[in-house]
């Protein structure tokens, strides 16, 4: 809390807050809980369209899938905790987002995990990766929720640090929807789940400041302890309770613990709450009321129910072996009062906890873009560099640790443009997350637009009509003027791109103060998207013998932030621009081509450019190709720029020759560049050979990720 905020609180109360009140206020006024630095900009984001049932403001967003099915979706970061204790930090990140979905009345059905680390040459970064992946895998597998996709990327700005973002979707019937706030006084507050301990105390305040060099020792107690077995019981018990129709409001205890859950539940519609902190079941002896109120012990939920329904709901919890207690009630008066063994230990106006004033920091624009001459290296050397990049390698090592098939809904599995989950006999839900900090670092506005465009392309590539978005904004300290400016520009880019596609953000997360000892991370907006797809229309992904290969979209000289430049250590360049008109037209064209059954396979072009997209399709289809890159619709005649530019709006399509004329009619920029077949990848330029590689060699490199961790495949 800043000195001017402490002064404001003293003036409002007319006195000094006592120890319990001060601890609760510190938690609720933290950046992590209050969004005080980000709220002024977040209101720019579009939050409504015909698919949105519930936009931002509760624990998760809700999207209409059809008349009988709604989808709850949310995204969270657990960056600081995972950097300090990677296993526990990542595991509790999964637990938290699953409970966010659960408390809307939805059954969690899938997770995505966009995760980022420093260079793998360093042992500490390998330790963080292995711990985070094991934490996500163990927790997700044990609660029976599949992890179906995500990103695993590496960047020098994350040395000794990690970004762990987790998105979750759940499925629900409209009649089971429960709000996270109350609409009447007199309700009893029932706490259920794990006992409360000292873990996670000041978790939100720790997440609202940069990490020190000794964070691993100093901040370990701020990381919560995961217990997936209790979470599994909590999922089933919560849904059974919700299905009775007698749960009036429901929140999980995440950041800020009991203070945050109960004050937000009561305060949203102007009610108050009385909490009897000494009734909370404790895991450790001699805990103080302060510790009880701000503990972030995991696997706990807070239910608001009418007095006459308490016993019925309680019996459900007992059936699952879960401990439950009435810890308070909702009152008419808008105050937040805490008792401890009969003594009043806190008494605050509830809006002092829930309505935190915003802060607008100084902004300072910067520009890192500058024209850079394309390097004069051979095509073969450039391809080897990019194809062997840790960001391009197949992450099978990661996703094979996750049970991605539990619940039996996963139709399109990890490793494709987007995962697809079966919702009913005819339709599936496509789910994907994307971000490109290298583009955002060069130009935060266009980097953010690009993240939205890539999500749309990934959804469209599996035949899905995009429905809605969620965003996770990972930034360094907002107190740095350049960082705050890049945040504002990012939100502007996210808003403009979503509006152009007619999409809305239904939930999101902001994580500031991602820096270690004065070293800020790059701006890293991560966007996750949902789409609806007809299951029998999903195209393939790999090449097939004898089929034509086409490129949709125009390639520009846009190598700034590209994988090629990163591998060569080149700074600057121009970040790719999104031509919204072309991006939309191409997405609509691809969807129409899929609807008509014109395409056998589709892959969007993104990281690594056309060269990488083609090689990935060859490896997946176990089929070679011959492709003349001089035929690609492009504004440059440099083979390296055509092959490795990361221009937006582009797709590789694979189709039988008889469909060519129909496809040509759908796109402004379209060309056949070659044919699939044989056992090698052959790149040409004006008929001359640039590179020839056997598929076996391509696969050997592509599957070599475990070697970077010192493991054999």
Swiss-Prot record:
Residues the record lists as binding Mg(2+) 2: 100, 252
Reactions catalysed, as given in the entry: N(2)-formyl-N(1)-(5-phospho-beta-D-ribosyl)glycinamide + L-glutamine + ATP + H2O = 2-formamido-N(1)-(5-O-phospho-beta-D-ribosyl)acetamidine + L-glutamate + ADP + phosphate + H(+)
NCBIfam families found in the cross-reference section: FGAM_synth_II (TIGR01736), PRK01213.1 (NF002290)
GO molecular function: ATP binding; magnesium ion binding; phosphoribosylformylglycinamidine synthase activity
GO CC annotation, single: cytoplasm
Major localization listed first in the record, in broad terms: cytoplasm
Residues that coordinate or bind ATP: 35, 471, 508
Subcellular location: Cytoplasm
Transmembrane feature ranges: none
Xref: InterPro entries: PRibForGlyAmidine_synth_PurL (IPR010074), PurL_linker (IPR041609), PurM-like_C_dom (IPR010918), PurM-like_C_sf (IPR036676), PurM-like_N (IPR016188), PurM-like_N_sf (IPR036921)
Functional note: Part of the phosphoribosylformylglycinamidine synthase complex involved in the purines biosynthetic pathway. Catalyzes the ATP-dependent conversion of formylglycinamide ribonucleotide (FGAR) and glutamine to yield formylglycinamidine ribonucleotide (FGAM) and glutamate. The FGAM synthase complex is composed of three subunits. PurQ produces an ammonia molecule by converting glutamine to glutamate. PurL transfers the ammonia molecule to FGAR to form FGAM in an ATP-dependent manner.
Source organism superkingdom: Archaea
One of the GO biological process terms: purine nucleotide biosynthetic process
Binding site for substrate: 77-80, 99, 224, 296-298, 511
Disulfide partners: none
Sorted UniProt keywords: ATP-binding, Cytoplasm, Ligase, Magnesium, Metal-binding, Nucleotide-binding, Purine biosynthesis
Gene: purL
Annotated active site: 32, 78 (proton acceptor)
Protein name: Phosphoribosylformylglycinamidine synthase subunit PurL
Quaternary structure and interacting proteins, as annotated: Monomer. Part of the FGAM synthase complex composed of 1 PurL, 1 PurQ and 2 PurS subunits.
Residues at which Mg(2+) 1 binds: 76, 509
The protein's enzyme class: ligase
Annotated pathway: Purine metabolism; IMP biosynthesis via de novo pathway; 5-amino-1-(5-phospho-D-ribosyl)imidazole from N(2)-formyl-N(1)-(5-phospho-D-ribosyl)glycinamide: step 1/2
Family designation: Belongs to the FGAMS family.
EC nos: 6.3.5.3
Family matches, as Pfam families: AIRS (PF00586), AIRS_C (PF02769), FGAR-AT_linker (PF18072)
């Amino acid at each position: 809390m800043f000195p001017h905020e402490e002064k404001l609180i003293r003036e409002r109360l007319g006195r000094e807050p006592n120890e319990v009140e001060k601890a609760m206020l510190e938690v609720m006024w933290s950046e992590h809980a209050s969004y005080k630095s980000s709220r002024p900009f977040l209101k720019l984001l579009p939050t409504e369209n015909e698919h949105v049932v519930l936009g931002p403001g509760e624990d998760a967003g809700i999207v209409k899938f059809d008349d009988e099915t709604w989808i709850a979706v949310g995204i969270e970061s657990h960056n600081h905790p995972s950097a300090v204790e990677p296993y526990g930090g990542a595991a509790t990140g999964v637990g938290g987002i699953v409970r966010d979905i659960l408390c809307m009345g939805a059954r969690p059905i899938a997770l995505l995990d966009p995760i980022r680390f420093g260079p793998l040459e360093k042992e500490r970064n390998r330790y963080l990766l292995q711990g985070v992946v094991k934490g996500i895998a163990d927790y997700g597998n044990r609660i029976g929720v599949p992890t179906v996709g995500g990103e695993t990327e590496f960047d020098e700005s994350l040395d000794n640090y990690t970004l762990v973002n987790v998105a979750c979707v759940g499925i629900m019937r409209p009649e089971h929807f429960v709000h996270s706030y109350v609409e009447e006084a007199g309700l009893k507050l029932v706490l259920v789940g794990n006992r409360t301990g000292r873990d996670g105390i000041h978790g939100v305040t720790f997440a609202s400041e940069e990490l020190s060099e000794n964070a691993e020792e100093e901040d370990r107690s701020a990381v919560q302890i995961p217990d997936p077995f209790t979470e599994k019981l909590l999922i089933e018990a919560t849904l059974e309770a919700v299905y009775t129709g007698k749960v009036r409001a429901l929140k999980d205890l995440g950041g800020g613990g009991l203070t945050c859950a109960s004050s937000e539940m009561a305060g949203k519609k102007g009610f108050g709450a009385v909490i009897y902190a000494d009734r909370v079941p404790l895991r450790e002896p001699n805990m103080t009321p302060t510790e009880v109120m701000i503990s972030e012990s995991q696997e706990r939920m807070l239910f608001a129910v009418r007095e006459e329904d308490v016993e019925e709901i309680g019996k459900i919890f007992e059936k699952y072996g879960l401990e439950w207690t009435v810890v308070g009630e909702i009152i008419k008066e808008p105050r937040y009062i805490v008792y401890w063994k009969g003594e009043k230990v806190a008494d605050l106006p509830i809006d002092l906890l829930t309505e935190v004033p915003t802060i607008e920091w100084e902004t300072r624009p910067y520009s890192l873009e500058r024209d850079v001459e394309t390097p004069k290296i051979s095509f073969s050397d450039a391809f080897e560099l990019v194809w062997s990049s840790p960001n391009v390698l197949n992450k099978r090592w990661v996703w094979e640790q996750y049970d991605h098939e539990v619940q039996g809904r996963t139709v399109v599995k990890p490793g494709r443009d987007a995962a697809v989950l079966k919702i009913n006999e005819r339709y599936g839900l496509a789910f994907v997350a994307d971000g490109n900090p290298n583009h955002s670092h060069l130009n935060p506005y266009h980097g953010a637009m690009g993240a939205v465009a890539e999500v749309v392309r990934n959804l469209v590539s599996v035949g899905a009509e995009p429905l809605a978005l969620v965003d996770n904004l990972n930034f360094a300290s907002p107190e740095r003027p350049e960082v705050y400016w890049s945040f504002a520009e990012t939100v502007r880019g996210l808003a403009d791109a979503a509006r152009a596609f007619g999409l809305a953000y239904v939930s999101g997360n902001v994580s500031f103060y991602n820096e270690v000892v004065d070293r800020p991370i790059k701006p890293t907006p991560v966007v996750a998207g949902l789409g609806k797809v007809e299951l029998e229309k999903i195209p393939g992904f790999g090449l097939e013998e004898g089929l034509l290969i086409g490129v949709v979209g125009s390639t520009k000289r846009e190598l700034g932030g590209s994988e090629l430049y990163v591998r060569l250590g080149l700074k600057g360049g121009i970040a790719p621009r999104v031509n919204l008109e072309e991006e939309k037209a191409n997405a609509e064209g691809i969807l129409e081509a899929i609807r008509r059954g014109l395409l056998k396979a589709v892959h969007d072009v993104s990281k690594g450019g056309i060269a990488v997209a083609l090689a990935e399709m060859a490896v997946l289809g176990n089929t070679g190709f011959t492709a003349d890159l001089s035929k690609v619709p492009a504004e440059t005649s440099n083979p390296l720029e055509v092959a490795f530019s990361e221009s937006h709006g582009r797709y590789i399509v694979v189709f039988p020759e008889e469909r060519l004329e129909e496809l040509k009619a759908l796109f402004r920029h379209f060309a056949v560049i070659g044919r699939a077949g044989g056992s090698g990848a052959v790149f040409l330029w004006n008929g001359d050979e640039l590179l020839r590689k056997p598929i076996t060699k391509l696969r050997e490199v592509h599957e070599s990720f475990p070697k970077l961790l010192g493991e054999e495949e």
